[in-house]
UniProtKB/Swiss-Prot annotation:
HAMAP family in UniProt: GlmS
UniProt cross-references to Pfam families, sorted A to Z: GATase_6 (PF13522), SIS (PF01380)
Protein name listed in UniProt: Glutamine--fructose-6-phosphate aminotransferase [isomerizing]
Task performed by this protein: Catalyzes the first step in hexosamine metabolism, converting fructose-6P into glucosamine-6P using glutamine as a nitrogen source.
Catalyzed reactions per annotation: D-fructose 6-phosphate + L-glutamine = D-glucosamine 6-phosphate + L-glutamate
Organism taxonomic ancestry: Bacteria, Bacillati, Bacillota, Bacilli, Bacillales
Enzyme Commission numbers on file: 2.6.1.16
MF annotations from Gene Ontology: carbohydrate derivative binding; glutamine-fructose-6-phosphate transaminase (isomerizing) activity
Subcellular location: Cytoplasm
Length: 601
């Protein structure tokens, strides 16, 4: 959700900013803009829509500089248009600002300090830049004015400020929104994530909440709000820039679906010791083993992965587990056990709702574990422990390889805890994950069959239903989410046994119903549910597993361990959803109104 880049050095800032914004497209946005500073002042380029349109406008101008900031906006205050796009300037034109986040008290600040100011936008952001201008006119130096404003703000923010009277500085601050400082020789950068500015550096410094950062060409100075210098080490962003390119694929989503076998192999390698045994840091295992109940907190696809993880943890490790939607949990915390452990699942490690829960559970002193794809992310830094997905950059908004990686890591964690508890299981997990890897490869190779299924069942429909029982129900939720978010088909996932309690009333002639049948103990039951909907005119698509398949099934996945079937069956749904969106000529990688990383509550 939204993205910030900034550059100060000696090179062409305009081009570097545009390239940086292009790397942030995956986060989701509806407008974009940059500001570049030269001897003649600050030049703004802003456009509603795609960055390609912004580039056309910027490339048609000779204006350039060696200092600038850029922004992709996902509208929260005010509609997507030129006036509401970032960067924003103060009325005097002296100050220019980009901002991610939501300022909760902007109306109060506007009324108290800026009643005489004429605003050009509907945004909370413009209040910030006008306040800096206001306090500078009261005689405060820019850094002091900026700090004073930051102290007044309530809410989430990542800020990058330029002062036209000081062409050698970017002023930076953050709270609850991600922002990094990248360090180079003769230049420095700021970015919402490291991927944005890998073109310039892979050396970064973390910024903590409530800090002021003074970024110049040759120095980076970090202070707390009282002006005390804070020491901060530089770390290397372990990202291969080539991993963030589409390569031979038409879309990032298709590439990331095809990468899942390689991700499985990488996870097997990373979580295996030299003797071929599963390994996870002993401190993590001890904290998980000591817990009397586990609370998984997540959102969207990560929540669905958590539902599958609950099956592993309870059936293998024997630890009672609850799975909660982060945005609900933070406002309605349930009664907790005496020794809870919280597991936060987030591809980006920046999900605002999950972080809000983590802040509260940290206050209560509860142990926490983050499962994420991004080392050094906010959730990773603030939790007690982290398990990495090792999935590589996931650029498409619709998550695919992160989901399967999350499930794989949860399975490994559960098996190790089970062993720690003295619970013997009949699962050779590394061997079973290797079988899963081969099964995924088979499905990926069958992509033309998935395309045909999308054509046969979904090309003209406006609605679709996914049904399953037990663990297949959890996967049906993810299948429905994938389809709705990229094809815009109204899709819902249901427990097969719930059909007769209301949903079956929605079945009409030709309604596609995709059923999952990978669990032996409910195979007959889910097939009975499919007969119920067929009797009412539904168009059935049955996805089953070898050994449980029946004549007439639409597609049969290779046989794997029954608890690991989500890792395989979901790939069919990912591909079917991809082709359904493609057939409707939609933007598969950047669906409307959605953001990859939801960094505001």
């Amino acid at each position: 959700m939204c993205g910030i880049v900034g550059y100060i050095g000696y090179d062409n800032a305009k081009e570097l900013l545009l390239k940086g914004l292009e790397k942030l497209e995956y986060r989701g946005y509806d407008s974009a803009g940059i500001a570049v500073v030269n001897d003649d002042g600050t030049k703004l380029f802003k456009e509603k829509g795609r960055i390609a349109e912004l580039r056309k406008v910027a490339d048609n101008s000779d204006e350039d500089g060696t200092l600038g900031i850029g922004h992709t906006r996902w509208a929260t205050h005010g509609v997507p248009n030129y006036e509401n796009s970032h960067p924003h300037q103060s009325t005097s034109g002296r100050f220019t600002l980009v901002h991610n986040g939501v300022i909760e008290n902007y109306e109060e600040l506007k009324a108290e300090y800026l009643s005489d100011v004429t605003f050009s936008s509907e945004t909370d952001t413009e209040v910030i830049v006008q306040l800096v201008d206001y306090f500078s006119r009261q005689g405060l130096a820019t850094e002091d004015a900026f700090t004073k404003v930051v102290k007044l703000l309530h809410g989430s923010y990542a800020l990058g400020l330029l002062d036209d009277n000081d062409k050698d500085t970017i002023y930076v601050a953050k709270n609850k929104s991600p922002l990094l400082v990248g360090v180079g020789e003769g230049f420095n950068v700021i970015a919402s994530d490291a991927l944005a500015m890998l073109q310039t550096t892979n050396q970064y410094k973390e910024i903590h909440d409530h800090e002021i950062v003074i970024v110049k060409r040759d120095t980076v100075e970090i202070k707390d709000l009282e002006g005390h210098i804070q020491q901060r080490d530089t770390y290397t962003a372990e990202i291969d820039a080539a991993d963030a390119e589409k390569g031979v694929y038409d879309h990032y989503m298709l590439k990331e679906i095809h990468e899942q076998p390689a991700v499985m192999r990488r996870i097997i390698q990373e979580y295996q010791d030299e003797k071929g045994n599963l390994k996870i840091d002993s401190e993590i295992i001890n904290d998980v083993a000591d817990a009397d109940r586990i609370y998984i907190v997540a959102a969207g696809t990560s929540y669905h992965a958590g539902l599958v993880g609950k099956e592993f943890i309870e059936k293998w490790a024997g630890v009672p587990t609850e799975v909660h939607v982060a945005s609900e949990f933070v406002y309605n915390m349930p009664l907790l056990s005496e020794k809870p452990l919280f597991i936060y699942i987030s591809q980006s490690g920046e999900t605002a709702d999950s972080r809000a829960v983590l802040v509260e559970t940290n206050k209560l002193g509860h142990k926490s574990l983050t499962i994420t794809n991004v080392a050094g992310s906010t959730l990773s830094r603030e939790a007690d422990h982290t398990l990495l997905l090792h999935a590589g950059p996931e650029i498409a908004v619709a998550s695919t390889k992160a989901y399967t990686a999350q499930i794989a890591v949860l399975s490994i964690l559960s098996q190790i805890v089970a062993k720690n508890h003295g619970r013997e299981t009949d699962v050779d997990l590394l061997r079973e994950l290797a079988k899963v890897t081969t099964a995924i490869e088979t499905i990926v190779d069958d992509a033309p069959k998935m395309e045909q299924i999308a054509t046969d069942f979904l090309k003209t429909t406006r609605n679709a239903f996914f049904i399953g029982r037990t663990i297949d129900y959890n996967v049906s939720l993810e299948g429905a989410l994938k389809l709705k978010e990229i094809s815009y088909i109204q899709a819902e996932g249901f427990a097969g046994g719930e059909l007769k309690h209301g949903t079956i009333a929605l079945i009409e002639d030709g309604t596609p119903v995709i059923g999952l049948a990978t669990q032996e103990n409910v195979n007959l039951s889910i097939r009975g549910n499919m007969k119920e909907v067929v009797a009412r005119g539904a168009y059935p698509c049955m996805i089953s597993m070898e050994g449980l398949n029946k004549e007439g099934d639409t597609y049969v996945i290779p046989q794997v361990h029954e608890l690991l079937t989500p890792l395989v069956s979901v790939v069919t749904m990912q591909l079917i959803s991809y082709y359904a969106a493609l057939q409707r000529d939609l933007d598969v990688d950047k669906p409307r109104n959605l953001a990859k990383s939801v960094t505001v509550e």
